[in-house]
Amino acid sequence: MIARVPYPVANTGVDWLFERGRPCYWKSAFFSELSDAAIGVLADAFARAPTDKCLLVIERFGGEAARVEPTATAYPHREAGHNLLLISQWTDPADSDAGIAWARTTFDALAPHMADRAYTNYLPADDHDRVRQAFGVNYDRLVELKRRYDPNNLFHLNQNIDPARSS
């Protein structure tokens, strides 16, 4: 059944998949199209997933959000396309290395099929170099704003725009 639901309800619809406290590692990327080759990489990856808790979320972008100019807000990637979110989860802390390696290896195998952009909310803490991709054409402007309003980088516990970095 398809129906309109309030945003808070939609935003919690998959909470049951994410047990509180369960270790996990995410990687995500935009794709202009989901080619047969990319789908093949995903099928192979999930055939060798380290646990049965690993997930793939595919989000469709575009529609009404695509009518906003890329420079109107900090978020520029409004054109149609897909965002894939690889989620590796495990219950035994001893499986951490394998879970993280699986997500990274799968992400690397998908690289030839990815668009050159990233979704800010899904960047893991170790993906500093992709922050520029996440903000795209707005990155240099955001660095200047950060230098002006947060030169000491007080607000850095996020997908950080470092004011000390050259724009």
Located regions from the model:
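Soluble FAD-dependent oxygen oxidases
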Residues: 1-167
